[in-house]
């Protein structure tokens, strides 16, 4: 089992690049050792989320309202937070986004174990939801191997005290594999874990022009490295969740969502089964399981202020105004690791800084927010999608992101993350680096550069990453 904290890994050095193509990445005995120091602790762990600096009083009100709703526990019927299901993955946003505090990523202790039987539900916990593993959503491929790309919710409301006579069955996810890594088992299923939302408003506020300008400016440095990358942008057609109006989408593992509002609307529907103005259709239309004929979530124009906006707008407001992660105080080791991060090529994709343009903070605002506009975002991402090869490929196409392509994951806050990569297969940041290499990956040369560093240099680079 993968455990949080120190765990030694042997890092091979001097490995010919051609070996990477065949996935021969197993650590070899007799070489220097670098070690993942584990999840970085901070005084803010478990504390209340911090908003962006410089918010106005009104913006702070919308942030706090969004935070409250982000933590609400949804129910099937009765009360004010109703509409859960009939198929769902969890019953509150914050259950999946709580490491190191609300708005973060998957926690060390999987909350879905308790959600399975909440309020009398009769769900079985799927094999890939381990008590000490990450929160995972499941996507089925079709029987002929062509992926459908859709999330298939792991739980149903059957048996709950607030579900009435609704009776539907869970999907069948067997045969089982490794419950912690999610590897092995049913080859027809791929997994995704939650992405952190800290600093998401700054990412949303980065204009397309800045992303494209950096792509052009870095083209020369990428020559000969195998690194390419392109925006997830599709020309033509009607605007949808993948933003095929030609603009650059940027949220999600494949940068499939353009805006935080779209990101929130899709998650509310897909993860909790709650219909809303952007996604009005139920996840399951079985008779007897339809509590409401209209979307559960909508704007309430009979109220005023923050109470007017729908839940998905409130979620978007919270994420938009949530401050970015705070890095640790630099040390000699992390400063040297930062320099190595650049020199071996990691920064070719994990761009340290991009700058925002004009941006509003809440759905009801009409003027740019000083807290979001023209700010430096130290996200460590170019917001492009890259070919990551056969080792990481999930076979899913979303927008212009193909079966083995993923968005460059922003690394701010990575030092406090427990699980890594799109499916949460490892809690060891060194293994996550090694898994960037494989047949067809743009990162092969960069991983090779890491592997030929001395053990001391490797350790400094790892320490730098854990300081973010």
Where are these regions (language model features)?
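Bacterial N-terminal signal peptides
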Residues: 14-27
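Enrichment for repetitive, rod-forming helical segments
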Residues: 10, 14-17, 148, 465
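Periplasmic c-type cytochrome electron-transfer domains
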Residues: 28-468
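N-terminal secretory signal peptides that target proteins for export/translocation
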Residues: 1-10
């Amino acid at each position: 089992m993968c455990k949080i904290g120190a765990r030694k890994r042997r890092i091979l050095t001097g490995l010919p690049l051609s070996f990477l193509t065949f996935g021969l990445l197993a650590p070899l005995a007799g070489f220097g050792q670098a070690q993942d120091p584990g999840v970085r602790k901070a005084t803010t762990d478990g504390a209340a989320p911090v908003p962006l600096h410089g918010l106005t009083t009104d913006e702070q009100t919308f942030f706090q309202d969004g935070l409250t709703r982000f933590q609400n526990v949804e129910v099937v019927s009765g009360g004010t937070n109703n509409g859960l299901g009939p198929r769902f993955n969890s019953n509150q946003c914050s259950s999946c986004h709580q490491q190191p505090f609300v708005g973060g990523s998957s926690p060390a202790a999987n909350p879905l174990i308790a959600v399975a039987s909440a309020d009398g539900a009769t769900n079985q916990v799927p094999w890939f939801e381990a008590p000490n593993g990450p929160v995972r959503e499941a996507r089925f491929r079709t029987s002929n191997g062509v992926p459908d790309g859709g999330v298939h919710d792991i739980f149903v409301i059957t048996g709950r005290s607030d579900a009435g006579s609704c009776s539907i069955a869970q999907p069948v996810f067997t045969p089982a594999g490794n419950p912690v890594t999610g590897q092995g088992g049913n080859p027809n299923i791929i997994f995704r874990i939650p992405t952190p939302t800290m600093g998401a408003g700054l990412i949303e506020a980065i204009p397309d022009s800045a992303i494209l300008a950096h792509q052009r400016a870095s083209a020369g440095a990428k020559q000969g490295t195998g690194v390419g990358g392109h925006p997830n942008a599709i020309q033509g057609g009607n605007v949808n969740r993948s933003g095929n109006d030609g603009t650059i989408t940027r949220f999600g593992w494949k940068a499939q969502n353009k805006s935080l509002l779209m990101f929130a609307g899709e998650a509310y529907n897909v993860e909790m089964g709650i219909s809303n103005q952007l996604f009005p259709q139920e996840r399951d239309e079985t008779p007897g399981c339809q509590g409401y004929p209209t979307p559960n979530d909508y704007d309430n124009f009979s109220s005023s202020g923050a109470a007017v906006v729908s839940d998905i707008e409130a979620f978007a407001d919270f994420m938009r105004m949530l401050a970015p992660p705070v890095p640790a105080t630099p040390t000699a080791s992390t400063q040297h690791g930062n320099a190595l991060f650049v020199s071996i090529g990691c920064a070719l994709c994990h761009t340290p800084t991009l700058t925002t343009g004009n941006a509003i903070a809440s759905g009801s605002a009409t003027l740019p927010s000083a807290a979001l506009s023209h700010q430096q975002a130290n996200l460590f991402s170019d917001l492009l999608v890259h070919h990551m090869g056969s080792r990481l490929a999930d076979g899913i196409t979303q927008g212009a992101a193909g079966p083995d392509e993923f968005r460059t994951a922003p690394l701010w806050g990575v030092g406090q993350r427990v699980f890594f990569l799109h499916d949460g297969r490892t809690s060891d940041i060194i293994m996550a680096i090694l898994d960037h290499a494989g047949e067809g990956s743009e990162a092969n040369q960069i991983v090779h550069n890491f592997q030929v560093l001395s053990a001391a240099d490797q350790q400094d680079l790892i320490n730098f990453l854990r300081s973010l």
